[in-house]
Design a protein with these regions (language model features):
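Glycine-enriched alpha-helix->loop->beta-strand junction motifs that scaffold or abut catalytic
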Residues: 132-138, 156-161, 180-186, 207-211
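His/Asp/Glu-enriched, well-ordered alpha-helical/loop segment
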Residues: 113, 178, 183-186, 194-281
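Structural recognition of alpha->loop->beta junctions
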Residues: 129-149, 234-245
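Divalent metal-coordination and catalytic microenvironments
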Residues: 27, 76, 80, 111, ...
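C-terminal cap of metal-dependent C-N hydrolases
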Residues: 250-252, 269-316
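Short beta-strand/loop segments at the ligand-binding rim of alpha/beta enzyme cores
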Residues: 107-119
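Divalent-metal coordination cores built from histidine and acidic residues
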Residues: 1-110, 151-185
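Histidine/acidic-residue-rich catalytic or RNA/ligand-binding cores of hydrolases
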Residues: 10, 39-40, 90-92, 128-134, ...
């Protein structure tokens, strides 16, 4: 996951999947979002200031950051998530960056000392540059990437992954009126402008060979789980990927992102047998992946979790 709602929630679920208690996908157990007072993820209220009421882990200063990262590593997370920029829907503009460079440096330093991945919510220009300069591998959003940020990413493109979360932006702008987020409201928030900027940023990153991943911010009412394949359609229709490029973003790049580059992401000898069988050709129509009725089989590590139908009768076939 990108981040979790409680300190050990992802760890407990990951462990239950890995020991066979429950069925689930491979994923990196994440920390809560690490944020600052008043930042994205600080959901405490004046009358309920206790940390237990916050969605994120709230820190202020380098030493609080160090202690926070060490505690998450003690709990057994695989990755740390830090909110480097704002989020307009919470009242802090997406272009705003709230952490100091020292706080970011300590976060990455401690995470790397424990061998953990670091991911960042980074919409603002400054936050994108900090991800590259400080060594944060997984960059969520990267909407407002200027030329300097693009140059930095291109020069370090084998060290970073960008997950723009386009479906969240698109649905927030155009398909969330039921939840009070009308196009008029989201335009005032700045999301329509950000969507335009994000599409242009992703087009530029694709031209420069920067690895772009699907996923991110699914689980909202207007971006429900199980609709993740919509990202691949947007990659093709909006940022110019070929269907093959979009498929590679969802398969081949997942391995190195999860530090399992030699084990997953490909169907070949030596890799784990994680296979999706589709009734259709996504190279001809990438949207076929969104039709759940056409998912014939789901296999993880050689075990079917949805087995393909087996014909009990069929026409005779003769071999010469």
């Amino acid at each position: 996951g990108a981040a979790t709602a409680k300190p050990r929630l992802d760890v407990v679920i990951r462990n239950a999947i890995n020991d066979g208690t429950i069925v689930g996908p491979r994923y990196l157990a994440a920390s809560q979002e690490i944020t600052v007072p008043g930042g994205l993820g600080d959901t405490t209220a004046p009358h309920l200031p206790q940390a237990e009421f916050a969605f994120g882990a709230v820190v202020s200063g380098a030493e609080e950051m160090r202690r926070c990262v060490r505690m998450f590593c003690k709990y057994g997370v695989d990755s740390l998530k830090i909110n480097l920029s704002g989020e307009s829907i919470t009242g802090m503009p997406s272009e705003m960056s709230q952490f100091t460079e020292e706080e970011i440096r300590v976060c990455v330093e401690e995470a790397k000392a424990w061998g953990k991945r670091v991911a960042a919510h980074a919409r603002s220009t400054w936050s994108i540059k900090q991800c590259v300069k400080q060594g944060i591998e997984v960059i969520y959003h990267a909407s407002f990437a200027d030329e300097e940020a693009l140059d930095l990413l291109e020069a370090n493109k084998f060290n970073h992954f960008v997950a723009p979360g386009l479906a969240w932006l698109i649905n927030t702008c155009h398909h969330a009126s039921t939840w009070g987020l009308t196009p008029e409201v989201t335009r005032k928030m700045g999301y329509h402008r950000e969507l335009e900027a994000a599409i242009e940023s992703m087009k530029a990153m694709r031209r420069r060979g920067i690895r772009i991943l699907p996923g991110g911010d699914y689980g909202f009412a207007w971006t429900p789980h199980g609709t993740n394949a919509k990202d691949l359609e947007y990659f093709v229709k909006l940022i110019g990927m070929s269907p093959m490029e979009a498929l590679l973003s969802a398969t081949a790049w997942g391995g190195p992102m999860m530090k399992m580059g030699k084990e997953i992401g490909y169907i070949r000898e030596g890799c784990l047998a994680d296979i999706l069988l589709i009734d259709g050709d996504p190279l001809a129509d990438i949207t076929v992946l969104q039709d759940k009725a056409r998912i014939l089989a789901v296999m993880k590590d050689g075990e079917f979790h949805r087995a393909p139908p087996v014909r009990h009768t069929r026409a005779n076939r003769w071999a010469a």
